[in-house]
Amino acid sequence: MGDLTLPINSGAALAIHVALSAGIVAAIIVVAAWLREKRSGARPDVPYEGGVLPAQPQQGPLNAPYFLIAALFVIFDMEAAILFAWAVAARDAGWLGLIEAAVFIGVLLLALVYLWLDGALDWVKGKRR
């Protein structure tokens, strides 16, 4: 069986990649616009939440700490990525690697306990148990 690679310079490969990516994004947008539900008489100034119209207008900013939960997720998700890399090399790391991983997990657990006691994980502020 012969060689299946084609000689191509990096600029052409980048151009092909960008063109294909833009084409896929454009196709997704066109298909989504074509498949979406057409709503006649819809008011664009009313927020749409689960198909239910709001009972009363919003009075001020919504207290939803999505960004805080997302940031905490990213921080603690990095723990999984780092520990996966450690698990791949666990045999080569030996006991010292195991101790380092245990210290790493311990520090992250202390950070989680601190955030929990500080109330950073409470969705509604002021409702302590």
Swiss-Prot record:
Catalytically driven reaction(s): a quinone + NADH + 5 H(+)(in) = a quinol + NAD(+) + 4 H(+)(out)
Localization: Cell inner membrane
Membrane topology label: Multi-pass membrane protein
Enzyme Commission identifier(s): 7.1.1.-
Gene Ontology CC terms, in alphabetical order: NADH dehydrogenase complex; plasma membrane
Transmembrane segments: 14-34, 67-87, 95-115
Record flagged with keyword Membrane: yes
Region forming the signal peptide: none
Pfam families: Oxidored_q4
UniProt cross-references to InterPro entries, sorted A to Z: NAD(P)H_OxRDtase_bac/plastid, NADH_UbQ/plastoQ_OxRdtase_su3, NDAH_ubi_oxred_su3_sf
Record's keyword annotation contains rRNA processing: no
Keywords assigned by UniProt, alphabetized: Cell inner membrane, Cell membrane, Membrane, NAD, Quinone, Translocase, Transmembrane, Transmembrane helix, Transport, Ubiquinone
Gene Ontology MF terms: NADH dehydrogenase (ubiquinone) activity; NADH:ubiquinone reductase (non-electrogenic) activity; quinone binding
Binding partners and assembly: NDH-1 is composed of 14 different subunits. Subunits NuoA, H, J, K, L, M, N constitute the membrane sector of the complex.
Family: Belongs to the complex I subunit 3 family.
The protein's role, per its UniProt record: NDH-1 shuttles electrons from NADH, via FMN and iron-sulfur (Fe-S) centers, to quinones in the respiratory chain. The immediate electron acceptor for the enzyme in this species is believed to be ubiquinone. Couples the redox reaction to proton translocation (for every two electrons transferred, four hydrogen ions are translocated across the cytoplasmic membrane), and thus conserves the redox energy in a proton gradient.
Name used for this protein in its record: NADH-quinone oxidoreductase subunit A
